[in-house]
Swiss-Prot record:
EC class of the enzyme, as a word: transferase
EC number: 2.3.1.-
Entry protein name: Uncharacterized acetyltransferase MJ1064
Highest taxon in the source lineage: Archaea
Molecular function GO labels: acyltransferase activity
PANTHER family (UniProt xref): LIPOPOLYSACCHARIDE BIOSYNTHESIS O-ACETYL TRANSFERASE WBBJ-RELATED, SIALIC ACID SYNTHASE-RELATED
Keyword hit for Nucleotide-binding: no
Family named by the database record: Belongs to the transferase hexapeptide repeat family.
CDD domains: LbH_MAT_like (cd04647)
Alphabetized UniProt keyword annotations: Acyltransferase, Repeat, Transferase
Length: 214
């Protein structure tokens, strides 16, 4: 059934109208919201609320086959967000870029609930990457030189690169300047502060390689 026929049939039945209105805040308004920000709503399957904040000269590019649930996507300054095909995002995920920051996510990636990605410099995530829930990927932190309030100091940022086919476990924190090689696995609760070689399994605080994938 075409969208036009569906709408006509719905408008003829008051009960159908009431049911449609119940879902309007999450589904219909989500489609309208995407359209306002220049994103083709037909490319996105949305469930729940979608918050997109696009400021100044920022750019948000979303490819096809995307599944979003209660997600917040925000691009500030001249920031850029590029999301590849078949991206699945669980509820309460936040994707943020600041200033000149860039966030690039490859194809066939998934992010679990309550995860946060903040890019001030550049965060690159390859294809076929699995990111579990409550993961934080942040490419910057505050300067903390003595003699000046930390809150007044500039951010110190370094790019993060995550290769293809990486699995990041629940509650992992990935900090600035880190490169995680293709096929690596990061165990739950780890804090990644240094590079992880390809096809390595790393765990702990800070994360250390304990073995290679076989």
């Amino acid at each position: 059934m075409s969208m036009i026929k569906l709408l006509k049939n719905t408008l003829k039945d008051p009960k159908k109208i009431m049911r449609a209105l119940e879902f309007a805040p999450s589904f219909v308004f989500g489609k309208i919201y995407l359209s306002i920000f220049g994103i083709n709503p037909l490319k996105v399957h949305n469930f729940g609320k979608i918050h997109i904040r696009k400021y100044d000269s920022s750019t948000i590019i979303i490819k096809s086959g995307i599944l979003l649930r209660d997600v917040e996507i925000a691009a500030r300054g001249n920031g850029k967000i590029i999301i590849g095909e078949n991206f699945h995002c669980e509820p309460y995920v936040r994707l943020n870029v600041f200033e000149e920051g860039i966030l690039e996510i490859g194809d066939n990636c998934g992010i679990g609930s309550f995860s946060i990605i903040n890019a001030t410099k550049k965060i690159t995530i390859g294809s076929n990457v699995l990111i579990s829930s409550h993961v934080h990927i942040i490419d910057g932190d505050h300067g903390f030189k003595k003699g000046e309030l930390i809150r007044n100091q500039k951010m110190v940022s370094e790019p993060i690169e995550i290769g293809d086919d990486v699995w990041i476990g629940t509650g992992v924190k990935i900090l600035k300047g880190v490169k995680i090689g293709e096929g690596a696995v990061i165990g739950a609760g780890s804090v990644v502060t240094r590079d992880i070689p390809p096809y390595s399994v790393a765990v702990g605080v800070p994360a250390r390689v304990i073995k290679k994938r076989e």
